[in-house]
Amino acid sequence: MSFDPKSILLFAIAILYALTIHEFFHAWTANKLGDPTAKMQGRLTLNPLAHLDPVGTICFIIAHFGWGKPVPVNPGYFKHPRRDDVLVSAAGPISNFVSAFIFGVIFQILNKFAIEASPLIVDLGNLLITTIQINLI
């Protein structure tokens, strides 16, 4: 990534998108499985500010590696605690995978018609793939 203002802005948008989708789907899945904790704490939202961790954000800026604020989950609310905890944990990485797939399809369609893909789509796709790889470790 270069350090011109446009690249920095595109990187920031990609990070906010990936982080927000990832954390939102942890919260959404927990809520659907019976745990209202994240909803009660205002985390069941697509507002990126609700999901930013100050230290994780600074690390993203400095090292291009960081994290969001962990979504609070209380397995005591789940009907099947072991299974539901795994589903909640998997929801974030799965959301990144689905997003990467969607942006990959968009990128391929644009290439097929010889339309240059927006740097945002390329950066977002690369970021989502990296996020998936990190979550699989």
Task: Give the predicted meaning of each segment.
Residues 1-137:
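Hydrophobic transmembrane alpha-helices and their immediate loop junctions
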